[in-house]
Amino acid sequence: MPPKGKGGKGAKGGAASGEAADKKAQTPKGGNAVKVRHILCEKHGKVMEAMEKLKSGVRFSEVATQYSEDKARQGGDLGWMTRGSMVGPFQDAAFALPVSTMDKPVYTDPPVKTKFGYHIIMVEGRK
């Protein structure tokens, strides 16, 4: 009989572990946070100039420093951003992008429009 009692406790613990495992299983798919960089321009013409620079092979951080109206000194690095901490269109785009590097960036094309202006977004990490 004692094994059943242990099994009962184990089952309860197992359910809790199962819930934690479910949360962990969901994390790699969409993640709850992204390490993001962006280039923000108020004017569409300026963001398209920045896009052309990126397409010609200029590093994302350099283009951000030259063109972005936000966080330019950090090369557009916003750090880790969690779900719910970003405006809707920015968040949707950030979580849809694959993780990429400065050497081979994958960014939003066309730029994403928010109340702040036009963003070119790239994601460097996901957790």
UniProtKB/Swiss-Prot annotation:
Record key words, sorted? Cytoplasm, Cytoskeleton, DNA-binding, Isomerase, Nucleus, Rotamase
Q: Where is this region: Disordered?
A: 1-33
EC class, as a word, reads isomerase
Q: Which reaction does it catalyse?
A: [protein]-peptidylproline (omega=180) = [protein]-peptidylproline (omega=0)
**Which coarse location class applies to the principal site listed for this UniProt protein?**
nucleus
**UniProt keyword annotation of Transmembrane helix present:** no
> What's the gene?
pin4
Known role: May be involved as a ribosomal RNA processing factor in ribosome biogenesis. Binds to DNA.
Q: Species name for this entry?
A: Xenopus tropicalis
Signal peptide range in chain numbering: none
Q: What is one term from the GO cellular component aspect held by the record? A: cytoplasm
Work out whether the entry's keyword set contains DNA-binding: yes
Q: Which PANTHER family match?
A: PTHR45995
Q: What is its EC number?
A: 5.2.1.8
Q: Which GO terms describe its molecular function?
A: DNA binding; peptidyl-prolyl cis-trans isomerase activity
> Would you tell me the protein name for this molecule?
Peptidyl-prolyl cis-trans isomerase NIMA-interacting 4
